[in-house]
Protein backbone atom coordinates (compact mmCIF):
# COMPACT_ATOMS: atom_id res chain seq x y z
CA UNK A 1 0.00 0.00 0.00
CA UNK A 2 2.83 2.38 0.86
CA UNK A 3 4.31 1.77 -2.60
CA UNK A 4 1.00 2.68 -4.21
CA UNK A 5 0.73 5.93 -2.26
CA UNK A 6 4.35 6.78 -2.97
CA UNK A 7 3.70 6.23 -6.65
CA UNK A 8 0.75 8.61 -6.58
CA UNK A 9 2.78 11.30 -4.84
CA UNK A 10 5.72 10.91 -7.26
CA UNK A 11 3.35 11.05 -10.23
CA UNK A 12 1.70 14.24 -9.01
CA UNK A 13 5.07 15.78 -8.18
CA UNK A 14 6.34 14.98 -11.66
CA UNK A 15 3.36 16.72 -13.23
CA UNK A 16 3.97 19.79 -11.06
CA UNK A 17 7.60 19.97 -12.07
CA UNK A 18 6.73 19.43 -15.71
CA UNK A 19 4.24 22.26 -16.05
CA UNK A 20 5.26 24.47 -13.12
CA UNK A 21 1.87 26.15 -12.85
CA UNK A 22 0.30 24.74 -9.68
CA UNK A 23 -1.42 27.37 -7.55
CA UNK A 24 -1.89 26.97 -3.77
CA UNK A 25 -5.56 26.04 -4.20
CA UNK A 26 -4.66 23.38 -6.75
CA UNK A 27 -2.01 21.98 -4.44
CA UNK A 28 -4.59 21.70 -1.64
CA UNK A 29 -6.97 19.91 -4.03
CA UNK A 30 -4.26 17.45 -5.05
CA UNK A 31 -3.35 16.83 -1.40
CA UNK A 32 -7.01 16.12 -0.67
CA UNK A 33 -7.12 13.61 -3.52
CA UNK A 34 -4.03 11.83 -2.19
CA UNK A 35 -5.48 11.71 1.34
CA UNK A 36 -8.78 10.34 0.03
CA UNK A 37 -6.99 7.70 -2.03
CA UNK A 38 -4.92 6.65 0.98
CA UNK A 39 -8.02 6.28 3.14
CA UNK A 40 -9.80 4.23 0.50
CA UNK A 41 -6.82 1.93 0.11
CA UNK A 42 -6.49 1.58 3.88
CA UNK A 43 -10.08 0.30 4.05
CA UNK A 44 -9.46 -2.42 1.49
CA UNK A 45 -8.89 -6.01 2.58
CA UNK A 46 -5.23 -6.79 3.18
CA UNK A 47 -4.28 -10.25 1.95
CA UNK A 48 -0.49 -10.47 2.24
CA UNK A 49 1.85 -10.56 5.20
CA UNK A 50 3.80 -7.57 3.88
CA UNK A 51 0.70 -5.50 4.60
CA UNK A 52 -0.19 -7.27 7.83
CA UNK A 53 0.66 -4.45 10.24
CA UNK A 54 -1.07 -1.10 9.74
CA UNK A 55 -0.09 1.97 11.76
CA UNK A 56 -3.09 3.82 13.22
CA UNK A 57 -3.39 7.48 14.24
CA UNK A 58 0.25 8.18 13.30
CA UNK A 59 1.24 5.43 15.75
CA UNK A 60 -0.18 7.41 18.68
CA UNK A 61 -2.42 5.52 21.16
CA UNK A 62 -5.78 7.04 22.05
CA UNK A 63 -5.80 6.61 25.83
CA UNK A 64 -7.49 9.28 27.92
CA UNK A 65 -5.78 10.85 30.95
CA UNK A 66 -7.98 8.64 33.14
CA UNK A 67 -6.83 5.57 31.22
CA UNK A 68 -3.23 6.47 32.05
CA UNK A 69 -3.79 6.92 35.79
CA UNK A 70 -1.76 4.81 38.23
CA UNK A 71 -4.35 5.21 41.00
CA UNK A 72 -5.26 1.50 40.84
CA UNK A 73 -1.69 0.25 40.59
CA UNK A 74 -1.02 -2.79 38.40
CA UNK A 75 -4.03 -4.56 36.92
CA UNK A 76 -5.54 -6.40 33.95
CA UNK A 77 -9.17 -6.74 32.87
CA UNK A 78 -10.72 -9.00 30.24
CA UNK A 79 -14.14 -8.60 28.65
CA UNK A 80 -16.76 -11.30 29.15
CA UNK A 81 -17.34 -13.59 26.19
CA UNK A 82 -20.25 -12.46 24.03
CA UNK A 83 -23.27 -14.55 22.98
CA UNK A 84 -21.10 -16.28 20.35
CA UNK A 85 -18.34 -16.97 22.90
CA UNK A 86 -16.04 -14.44 21.25
CA UNK A 87 -13.41 -12.52 23.19
CA UNK A 88 -13.62 -8.76 23.63
CA UNK A 89 -11.32 -5.89 24.51
CA UNK A 90 -8.52 -6.56 26.99
CA UNK A 91 -6.90 -3.83 29.11
CA UNK A 92 -3.99 -3.69 31.53
CA UNK A 93 -1.65 -1.47 33.47
CA UNK A 94 1.50 -3.53 33.14
CA UNK A 95 4.55 -3.74 35.39
CA UNK A 96 7.45 -6.18 35.43
CA UNK A 97 6.24 -7.55 38.78
CA UNK A 98 3.32 -9.10 36.86
CA UNK A 99 5.58 -11.01 34.47
CA UNK A 100 5.67 -14.80 34.99
CA UNK A 101 8.70 -16.72 36.19
CA UNK A 102 7.32 -20.23 35.67
CA UNK A 103 7.18 -22.12 32.37
CA UNK A 104 3.97 -21.77 30.39
CA UNK A 105 1.57 -24.71 30.43
CA UNK A 106 0.30 -26.21 27.20
CA UNK A 107 -2.73 -24.41 25.77
CA UNK A 108 -5.93 -26.41 25.37
CA UNK A 109 -8.63 -23.74 24.92
CA UNK A 110 -10.31 -23.80 21.50
CA UNK A 111 -11.40 -20.23 20.65
CA UNK A 112 -14.21 -19.48 18.23
CA UNK A 113 -13.49 -20.35 14.59
CA UNK A 114 -10.82 -22.90 15.54
CA UNK A 115 -10.73 -25.06 12.39
CA UNK A 116 -7.11 -26.08 12.29
CA UNK A 117 -5.29 -26.93 9.08
CA UNK A 118 -1.74 -27.90 8.25
CA UNK A 119 -0.15 -25.65 5.66
CA UNK A 120 2.00 -26.76 2.73
CA UNK A 121 5.18 -25.84 4.61
CA UNK A 122 4.25 -28.14 7.49
CA UNK A 123 3.25 -25.39 9.93
CA UNK A 124 -0.28 -25.11 11.26
CA UNK A 125 -2.43 -22.29 9.92
CA UNK A 126 -3.92 -21.21 13.25
CA UNK A 127 -2.40 -20.27 16.59
CA UNK A 128 -4.15 -19.66 19.88
CA UNK A 129 -3.36 -15.96 20.18
CA UNK A 130 -3.22 -14.11 23.49
CA UNK A 131 -4.79 -10.67 23.71
CA UNK A 132 -2.44 -9.91 26.61
CA UNK A 133 0.63 -12.04 25.96
CA UNK A 134 1.65 -14.69 28.47
CA UNK A 135 5.09 -13.12 28.88
CA UNK A 136 3.46 -9.90 30.14
CA UNK A 137 1.18 -11.20 32.93
CA UNK A 138 1.31 -15.00 32.97
CA UNK A 139 -2.36 -15.29 31.96
CA UNK A 140 -2.62 -18.64 30.19
CA UNK A 141 -5.64 -20.88 29.59
CA UNK A 142 -8.18 -18.10 30.02
CA UNK A 143 -10.92 -18.29 27.35
CA UNK A 144 -11.40 -14.51 27.66
CA UNK A 145 -7.78 -13.97 26.58
CA UNK A 146 -7.43 -16.29 23.58
CA UNK A 147 -8.54 -15.80 19.99
CA UNK A 148 -8.00 -17.70 16.76
CA UNK A 149 -5.26 -16.10 14.69
CA UNK A 150 -3.09 -17.10 11.78
CA UNK A 151 0.51 -18.07 12.32
CA UNK A 152 1.83 -14.82 10.83
CA UNK A 153 -0.75 -12.78 12.76
CA UNK A 154 0.63 -14.24 15.98
CA UNK A 155 4.28 -14.38 15.08
CA UNK A 156 6.03 -12.33 13.95
CA UNK A 157 3.28 -9.65 14.01
CA UNK A 158 1.72 -9.64 17.50
CA UNK A 159 4.77 -11.09 19.21
CA UNK A 160 6.99 -8.33 17.84
CA UNK A 161 4.94 -5.71 19.69
CA UNK A 162 4.57 -7.83 22.81
CA UNK A 163 8.36 -8.18 22.87
CA UNK A 164 8.75 -4.40 22.67
CA UNK A 165 6.58 -4.06 25.77
CA UNK A 166 8.29 -6.89 27.65
CA UNK A 167 11.75 -5.52 26.92
CA UNK A 168 10.73 -2.05 28.09
CA UNK A 169 9.19 -3.39 31.32
CA UNK A 170 12.30 -5.40 32.19
CA UNK A 171 14.70 -2.60 31.34
CA UNK A 172 12.99 0.31 33.10
CA UNK A 173 10.74 -1.02 35.85
CA UNK A 174 8.15 1.51 34.65
CA UNK A 175 4.45 0.94 33.89
CA UNK A 176 2.82 0.49 30.49
CA UNK A 177 -0.85 1.05 29.71
CA UNK A 178 -1.88 -1.66 27.27
CA UNK A 179 -5.02 -2.37 25.25
CA UNK A 180 -5.91 -4.97 22.62
CA UNK A 181 -9.18 -4.85 20.67
CA UNK A 182 -10.13 -7.85 18.51
CA UNK A 183 -12.02 -6.87 15.37
CA UNK A 184 -15.03 -9.17 14.95
CA UNK A 185 -17.52 -8.14 12.28
CA UNK A 186 -21.18 -9.13 12.32
CA UNK A 187 -21.47 -12.67 13.64
CA UNK A 188 -18.13 -13.85 12.25
CA UNK A 189 -16.27 -16.31 14.48
CA UNK A 190 -12.76 -15.29 13.44
CA UNK A 191 -11.58 -11.73 14.01
CA UNK A 192 -10.44 -9.76 10.97
CA UNK A 193 -7.58 -8.44 13.06
CA UNK A 194 -6.71 -6.74 16.33
CA UNK A 195 -5.69 -3.25 17.37
CA UNK A 196 -2.77 -3.07 19.82
CA UNK A 197 -2.01 0.09 21.79
CA UNK A 198 0.68 0.77 24.38
CA UNK A 199 1.88 3.83 26.26
CA UNK A 200 4.59 3.99 28.93
CA UNK A 201 3.54 6.02 31.96
CA UNK A 202 6.63 7.41 33.66
CA UNK A 203 8.27 8.50 30.41
CA UNK A 204 7.71 8.53 26.65
CA UNK A 205 9.97 5.57 26.03
CA UNK A 206 7.30 3.31 24.57
CA UNK A 207 4.28 4.19 22.48
CA UNK A 208 2.49 2.51 19.57
CA UNK A 209 -0.93 2.09 17.97
CA UNK A 210 -1.15 -0.59 15.29
CA UNK A 211 -3.78 -2.76 13.64
CA UNK A 212 -2.69 -6.29 12.76
CA UNK A 213 -4.64 -8.00 10.01
CA UNK A 214 -5.54 -11.63 10.70
CA UNK A 215 -4.36 -12.99 7.36
CA UNK A 216 -1.94 -15.61 6.10
CA UNK A 217 -0.15 -15.23 2.80
CA UNK A 218 -1.28 -17.89 0.32
CA UNK A 219 -4.52 -18.71 2.16
CA UNK A 220 -8.10 -17.45 2.04
CA UNK A 221 -9.94 -17.46 5.36
CA UNK A 222 -13.69 -17.69 5.81
CA UNK A 223 -14.02 -15.40 8.83
CA UNK A 224 -17.62 -16.52 9.29
CA UNK A 225 -16.67 -20.07 10.20
CA UNK A 226 -12.89 -20.37 10.41
CA UNK A 227 -12.67 -22.59 7.34
CA UNK A 228 -9.81 -21.89 4.95
CA UNK A 229 -8.43 -22.81 1.54
CA UNK A 230 -5.27 -22.35 -0.46
CA UNK A 231 -5.37 -19.16 -2.50
CA UNK A 232 -5.51 -19.73 -6.25
Regions found by a protein language model. Give the residues of each.
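Positively charged n-region of N-terminal signal peptides that target proteins for export
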Residues: 1-4
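Membrane-embedded alpha-helical bundles that constitute the cytochrome b-like, heme-associated redox core
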Residues: 6, 34-42, 162, 225, ...
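Hydrophobic membrane-insertion alpha-helices, especially the h-region
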Residues: 7-20
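N-terminal, intrinsically disordered, polar/charged segments of Gram-positive cell-envelope systems
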Residues: 24-75
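Domain-level detector of nuclease and nuclease-like folds
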Residues: 67-232
Amino acid sequence: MKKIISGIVVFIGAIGIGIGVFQPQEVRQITSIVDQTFNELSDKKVEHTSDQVEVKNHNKPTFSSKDLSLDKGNWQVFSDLDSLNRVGEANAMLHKSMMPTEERERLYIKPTGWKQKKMKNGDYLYNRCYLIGYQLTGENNNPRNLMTGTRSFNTPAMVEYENKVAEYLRRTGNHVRYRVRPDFRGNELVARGAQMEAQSIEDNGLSFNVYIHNTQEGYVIDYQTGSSRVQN
